[in-house]
């Protein structure tokens, strides 16, 4: 039986496209919030598949959409909003975070890879975690790390992206039964 997969994003959706192509499976539903055009350009591979919600969607708006699915796996890919507690408690939601919060809890929140790079952290990485109502507070279920000694900013972006994609692909293969 096919497991429903729902994704949320607030930025470009590029990560979703790369994961989907690698898995040879697209999400059953792709949700993004309405934002001014100058703040982002959505990956053209997603444009036809996207459902828009308000910039700051209400619990009711989210529940109306999600309730149509039976026990879906929900993944967040650059979703720049805190999920309401009632949604977190009712659904299995996972987030990818580009900061090694298992080692550096101060990297919770937006753009941790930039903070780690500028702070010359010796080890960097990313995690997948269960989503609860707090920002990056849920239980970490997987992590990938890399030596960040003397890397360039470009190398940091590539290493973080590659490790994040690896985590997502391996997690989704198991979770979606692929």
Language model regions located:
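One-carbon transfer enzymes
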Residues: 1-178
């Amino acid at each position: 039986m096919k497991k429903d997969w729902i994704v949320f994003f607030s930025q470009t959706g590029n990560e979703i496209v790369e994961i989907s192509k690698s898995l040879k499976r697209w999400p059953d539903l792709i949700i993004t919030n309405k934002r001014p055009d100058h703040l982002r350009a959505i990956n053209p591979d997603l444009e036809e598949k996207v459902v828009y919600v308000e910039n700051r969607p209400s619990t009711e708006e989210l529940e109306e959409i999600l309730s149509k699915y039976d026990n879906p796996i929900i993944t967040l890919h650059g979703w720049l909003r805190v999920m309401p507690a009632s949604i977190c408690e009712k659904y299995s939601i996972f987030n990818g975070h580009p900061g090694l919060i298992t080692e550096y809890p101060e990297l919770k929140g937006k753009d941790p890879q930039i903070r780690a790079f500028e702070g010359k952290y010796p080890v960097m990485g990313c995690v997948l975690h269960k989503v609860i109502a707090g920002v990056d507070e849920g239980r970490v279920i997987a992590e990938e790390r890399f030596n960040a000694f003397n890397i360039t900013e470009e190398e940091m972006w590539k290493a973080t992206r590659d490790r994040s994609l690896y985590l997502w692909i391996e997690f989704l293969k198991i979770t979606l039964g692929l």
